[in-house]
């Protein structure tokens, strides 16, 4: 291999990496939009009966003024973000105290509740909507089995990666759909507040998510979390095999078992080629099943990063709030949905490019959410007026 060759960057395969992460994100958003269009075409009726911690400080009413709605939505967002911050710091404390088994049990129980409770509610609504004949006992048995399998698929690595990815996307769909039932003003202010929180939690030195990641790196442990990991990009070539090459600088002062790892890169190594110099090259398959050898083997709760296998990891919270944005837009019209979807995809692409430059965990919400919110209001205030005027004057129809 040519030693002067530039190390392979994620920019060289940005197209495949984008598809690997944009496909599940798009499926999640499309499913939420579909559920919104089927189940609650009238947002006012569904919002009034739905309450959660996101509406603890203020309950929006149609008779309230716009200023009152904004202030109330701001209070709701502060309460919600504060609750998330406290919960995340509790998670940091438990991880610091090495209560990993308890965290895994808690995450598994949470996944079971989401699949069983929220999933059951949505399935009941769909059954009622389409008049599907099924008895309650059969429904409960199927729902229980589906939820149990989902918990094991998400938190046990022996399952197929496609099954795990499918369950993660479905969990994101369930949570996102119920977030779309929040009042309109609360939804938009909450999305902006969560984007700002994501920046602080991931990038600030005292951010809870950054503390978790640094602690996991220092201990060489995984954080129990709901994280979507895309498959790594593997290129097939008739003459070469893609490998991860660990270059070790052998030192005469140390024995062979304590070599210092200098560079970790993906390269195409000829199968016949065997290096013979002071710098030894050990090639291993690109999909490495030994996470303890990787420097970036941590699991991110939110944000975007690179896993030990070279695959991109995206927190399930990002799936959820992307889908909340387009789901809320679907309550207005589909033209706004298209605009918000393109804005989110563009923001995610920008975030992936930043990831390729900085090579560390980055918040995935800010760029996409900000672009999505801006495009939503531009579509409602400008694009709709333009399209209506063009249609009424037969310029387009």
Curated annotation (Swiss-Prot):
Residues 367-387 dip into the membrane without crossing it. This is Presenilin-like protein At2g29900. Keywords: Endoplasmic reticulum, Golgi apparatus, Membrane, Notch signaling pathway, Transmembrane, Transmembrane helix. The active site is at residues 198, 318. The chain crosses the membrane at residues 18-38, 77-97, 107-127, 136-156, 159-179, 189-209, 306-326, 337-357. Belongs to the peptidase A22A family. Pfam families: Presenilin. One of its GO terms (molecular function) is aspartic endopeptidase activity, intramembrane cleaving. Residues 1-17, 98-106, 157-158, 210-305, 358-366, 388-397 are cytoplasmic. A motif (PAL) lies at residues 363-365. It is a multi-pass membrane protein. The keyword Membrane applies. Probable subunit of the gamma-secretase complex, an endoprotease complex that catalyzes the intramembrane cleavage of integral membrane proteins such as Notch receptors. It is found in: Endoplasmic reticulum membrane; Golgi apparatus membrane. Homodimer. Probable component of the gamma-secretase complex, a complex composed of a presenilin homodimer, nicastrin, APH1 and PEN2. GO terms for biological process: Notch signaling pathway; protein processing. The PAL motif is required for normal active site conformation. One of its GO terms (cellular component) is Golgi membrane. Its main location: endoplasmic reticulum. Residues 39-76, 128-135, 180-188, 327-336 are lumenal.
């Amino acid at each position: 291999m040519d030693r002067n060759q530039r190390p392979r960057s994620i920019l060289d395969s940005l197209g495949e990496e984008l598809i690997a992460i944009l496909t599940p994100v798009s499926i999640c958003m499309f499913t939420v939009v579909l559920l919104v269009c089927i189940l609650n075409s009238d947002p006012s009726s569904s919002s009034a009966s739905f309450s959660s911690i996101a509406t603890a400080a203020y309950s929006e009413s149609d008779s309230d003024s716009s200023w009152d709605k904004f202030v109330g939505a701001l209070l709701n967002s502060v309460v919600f973000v504060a609750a998330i911050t406290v919960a995340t710091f509790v998670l940091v404390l438990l991880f610091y105290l090495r209560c990993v088994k308890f965290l895994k049990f808690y995450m598994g129980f949470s996944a079971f509740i989401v699949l069983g409770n929220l999933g059951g509610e949505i399935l009941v609504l769909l059954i009622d909507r389409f008049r599907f004949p099924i008895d309650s006992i059969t429904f409960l048995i199927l729902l229980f089995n589906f939820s149990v399998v989902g918990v094991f698929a998400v938190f046990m690595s022996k399952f197929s990666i496609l099954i795990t990815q499918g369950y993660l996307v479905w969990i994101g769909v369930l949570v996102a759909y119920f977030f779309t039932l929040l009042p309109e003003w609360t939804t938009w202010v909450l999305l902006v507040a969560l984007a700002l929180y994501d920046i602080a939690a991931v990038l600030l030195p005292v951010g809870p998510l950054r503390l978790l990641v640094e602690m996991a790196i220092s201990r060489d442990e995984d954080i129990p979390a709901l994280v979507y990991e895309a498959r790594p990009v593997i290129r097939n070539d008739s003459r070469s095999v893609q490998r991860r090459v660990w270059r070790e600088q052998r030192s005469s002062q140390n024995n062979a078992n304590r070599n210092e790892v200098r560079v970790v890169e993906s390269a195409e190594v000829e199968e016949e080629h065997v290096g013979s110099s002071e710098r030894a090259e050990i090639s291993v398959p690109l999909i490495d099943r030994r996470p303890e050898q990787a420097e970036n083997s941590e699991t991110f709760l939110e944000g975007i990063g690179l896993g030990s296998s070279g695959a991109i990891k995206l927190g399930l919270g990002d799936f959820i709030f992307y889908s909340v944005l387009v789901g809320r837009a679907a309550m207005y019209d589909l033209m706004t949905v298209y605009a918000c979807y393109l804005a989110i995809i563009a923001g995610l692409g920008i975030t992936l490019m930043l990831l390729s430059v900085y090579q560390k965990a980055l918040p995935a919400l800010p760029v996409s959410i900000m672009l999505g919110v801006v495009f939503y209001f531009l579509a409602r205030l400008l694009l709709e007026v333009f399209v209506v005027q063009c249609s009424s004057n037969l310029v387009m129809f």
